[in-house]
Design a protein with these regions (language model features):
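Short linear capping/connector segments at secondary-structure termini
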Residues: 45, 82, 96-103, 107
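N-terminal carbohydrate-binding/catalytic regions of secreted carbohydrate-active enzymes
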Residues: 60-67, 78, 82
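Short, charged helix-capping/linker segments at alpha-helix termini
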Residues: 67-76, 137
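Short, functionally critical alpha-helical segments immediately adjacent to catalytic or ligand/cofactor-binding
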Residues: 73-90, 97, 120-124, 148-153, ...
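Flexible domain-boundary/linker segments
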Residues: 80, 84, 99, 140-141, ...
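Glycine- and aromatic-rich loop/turn segments at beta-sheet edges
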Residues: 91-100, 170
Length: 204
C-alpha cells in the first residue's frame, strides 16, 4: 500500500472517530427536517425528578397505580409536583379536581371529594386527557407539558384555544384566557396564569 493511500485511510479513520464522539456527546438529541428548516428535538421520554413533601411521597404507590392505568406512568414525578402545588399532599382532595367532569361520585364543587384515592384517580385521569390534547410527547417535552399543566388548571378548553391562537402556552395568552373567562362568568379571578411554572419549580 502506497504512502498516499495510508494517509487517506488515516484521515478517514480520524473523521469517523470524531463523528462518533460528536454523536455520543449530543446523546439524546437528533435533528429532523420539516417545513424547510432544521429543528432540534430531545429524547422526550426521559423523566425528571420531583422535589416534594413527604405527605406527597406517601401517595406515590397510588400515583404509580393510576398513572399506569391511564397510560402516563412516565409522568409520575410530574404528577407529584402537581400534587405538591395543589395541596402539598394535605387534605382529602389532594389533586383539587372535584370540579372535573371525571368526578361522578360527588358534587362537582370545590373541595367536595372526601377520599384522597378517588381524588388521585380522578385528577390523573383528567391530566392524561390534558397531556393528550396538548400533544405532549413525554415528560421531557417541557413546552407541551406547560400547555397540559395550564389546561389542568384552567380546563381543557384552554388547550385547544391556546394552540389555535399561539401554538401553545404563553403567559400572555394564559392571562388573556383568564380575562376572557372572568368576563364571561362574572368572576373576580379565574385560575392561575403562571400555573406551569408553579408546578415545575418542584420538577427538575
Amino acid at each position: 500500500m502506497n504512502k498516499q493511500k495510508i494517509m487517506a485511510n488515516r484521515r478517514r479513520d480520524i473523521i469517523i472517530i470524531v463523528g462518533c464522539t460528536i454523536l455520543a456527546l449530543i446523546g439524546g438529541y437528533g435533528w429532523s427536517r420539516g417545513f424547510g428548516n432544521f429543528t432540534w428535538f430531545r429524547n422526550f421520554d426521559t423523566p425528571g425528578t420531583a422535589s416534594v413533601d413527604d405527605a406527597v411521597l406517601n401517595y406515590e404507590p397510588l400515583i404509580q397505580q393510576y398513572a399506569k392505568e391511564y397510560g402516563i406512568e412516565s409522568y409520575v414525578p410530574v404528577i407529584e409536583a402537581l400534587m405538591q402545588q395543589e395541596s402539598s399532599g394535605l387534605g382529602a382532595d389532594v389533586m383539587q379536581c372535584s370540579e372535573c367532569y371525571y368526578n361522578t361520585e360527588y358534587d362537582q364543587t370545590p373541595g367536595s371529594i372526601p377520599d384522597p384515592e378517588y381524588s388521585i384517580q380522578t385528577g390523573i385521569h383528567y391530566f392524561a386527557d390534558c397531556l393528550e390534547l396538548a400533544g405532549c410527547k413525554g415528560p421531557g417535552d417541557i413546552r407541551r407539558l406547560r400547555l397540559a399543566l395550564q389546561g389542568y388548571n384552567f380546563g381543557h378548553n384552554y388547550i385547544e384555544w391556546a394552540i389555535k391562537r399561539d401554538g401553545g402556552y404563553t403567559e400572555a395568552n394564559a392571562q388573556a384566557f383568564s380575562d376572557m373567562m372572568k368576563e364571561q362568568l362574572g368572576w373576580e379571578t379565574y385560575g392561575d396564569t403562571t400555573y406551569p411554572e408553579h408546578v415545575l419549580r418542584y420538577y427538575k
